[in-house]
From Swiss-Prot:
PANTHER family: ALPHA_BETA-HYDROLASES SUPERFAMILY PROTEIN, HYDROLASE. It comes from Escherichia coli O139:H28 (strain E24377A / ETEC). Residues 38-273 form the AB hydrolase-1 domain. One of its GO terms (molecular function) is protein homodimerization activity. Pathway: Aromatic compound metabolism; 3-phenylpropanoate degradation. Pfam families: Abhydrolase_1. This is 2-hydroxy-6-oxononadienedioate/2-hydroxy-6-oxononatrienedioate hydrolase. The lineage of its organism: Bacteria, Pseudomonadati, Pseudomonadota, Gammaproteobacteria, Enterobacterales. Homodimer. Belongs to the AB hydrolase superfamily. MhpC family.
Length: 288
C-alpha cells in the first residue's frame, strides 16, 4: 500500500491544559503511529503554527516510522491566547509536558526551531528523563551574541510586524528570514497574513507579554552542561534572526552535541534545505 501524505485537517486535535489556575485549550497535530515519537516545536513569528513551520518535514518522519506531534504553543495557531509575564519557554515546556502526559507518551525526541529550540532546552532541563534525542535549529540559549548587536535586525522586524501586522511589514520580515527569497510566493504571503489577522488576540497578547517582561527567553547558557541527551544543532550560515555564534555556544555547553551549518541558509533550515535537513535528522534519530 502506497504512503498517504498527512493532512492538517485529518490530524488536528485539542486537549485542555491547566496553567496558572486557568484552563487553556491547546491545539496539536498527531501524525503517524510509530513506537517512537518526535515532537516538533515552532518559532515565535506572527502567524506561526506547528503545521506551517514543518510542512516540508512531517511526511518524511512519518514515512520513516515515527509518530509526529506538532504543538501550537499558547498564543499561536488554534491554541488559546495568553499574556505571559514569565519565561515563555518554560511555559511552552509545561504545556508540552501536560500534552504528552495526557497522550501517555513516556519519552519523546524533541525538534525545535527558534523559540521551539529554546523551549526544547527548557523541557529537557526540567524533565531530562522524558527526552530521547534533541534537535535544536536556530534556537539560541537566550544569551547575548559575541559578534552581532542585539536585538538582531530580524527580531526588530518581527516585533514591528507584531505591532503593525501589514503585508508590507510581513514582506520586510520575510525578506531577511530566508536566504533565497525566490520561493516566497504571493500565495505564501497571503496565507501567512490571513493566519496572523485571524487571531489578532495572539498578536496583541504577544506585545503585552513583551511589555510585561521584555526577557521572555532567559539565558540557559549556565545550565547547558546539565543536558545529557544526544543533541544535533542545526544553523543557517546566513541567519539574521539568531546569530550563528549562538549555535557555537550550544555546541560548547552540551557535551553530547554536534553542529551542522547549512550555507546559503537563513533562519528556516527545515524549509530552505528541506531534503538535506530531513535526511540529516533521520540519520541522527536512527543512530544508537
Amino acid at each position: 500500500m502506497s504512503y498517504q501524505p498527512q493532512t492538517e485537517a485529518a490530524t488536528s486535535r485539542f486537549l485542555n491544559v491547566e496553567e496558572a489556575g486557568k484552563t487553556l485549550r491547546i491545539h496539536f497535530n498527531d501524525c503517524g503511529q510509530g513506537d517512537e515519537t518526535v515532537v516538533l516545536l515552532h518559532g515565535s513569528g506572527p502567524g506561526a503554527t506547528g503545521w506551517a513551520n514543518f510542512s516540508r518535514n512531517i511526511d518524511p518522519l512519518v514515512e520513516a516510522g515515527y509518530r509526529v506531534i506538532l504543538l501550537d504553543c499558547p498564543g499561536w495557531g488554534k491554541s488559546d491566547s495568553i499574556v505571559n509575564s514569565g519565561s515563555r519557554s518554560d511555559l511552552n515546556a509545561r504545556i508540552l509536558k501536560s500534552v504528552v502526559d495526557q497522550l501517555d507518551i513516556a519519552k519523546i525526541h524533541l525538534l525545535g526551531n527558534s523559540m521551539g529550540g529554546h523551549s526544547s532546552v527548557a523541557f529537557t532541563l526540567n524533565w531530562p528523563e522524558r527526552v530521547g534525542k534533541l534537535v535544536l535549529m536556530g534556537g539560541g540559549t537566550g544569551g547575548m551574541s559575541l559578534f552581532t548587536p542585539m536585538p538582531t535586525e530580524g527580531i526588530k522586524r518581527l516585533n514591528q510586524l507584531y505591532r503593525q501586522p501589514t503585508i508590507e511589514n510581513l514582506k520586510l520580515m520575510m525578506d531577511i528570514f530566508v536566504f533565497d527569497t525566490s520561493d516566497l510566493t504571493d500565495a505564501l504571503f497571503e496565507a501567512r497574513l490571513n493566519n496572523m489577522l485571524s487571531r489578532r488576540d495572539h498578536l496583541e497578547n504577544f506585545v503585552k507579554s513583551l511589555e510585561a517582561n521584555p526577557k521572555q527567553f532567559p539565558d540557559f547558557g549556565p545550565r547547558l552542561a546539565e543536558i545529557k541527551a544526544q543533541t544535533l544543532i542545526v544553523w543557517g550560515r546566513n541567519d539574521r534572526f539568531v546569530p550563528m555564534d549562538a549555535g557555537l555556544r550550544l555546541l560548547s555547553g552540551i557535551a553530547g552535541s554536534e553542529l551542522h551549518i547549512f550555507r546559503d541558509c537563513g533562519h528556516w533550515a527545515q524549509w530552505e534545505h528541506a531534503d538535506a535537513f530531513n535526511q540529516l535528522v533521520l540519520n541522527f534519530l536512527a543512530r544508537p
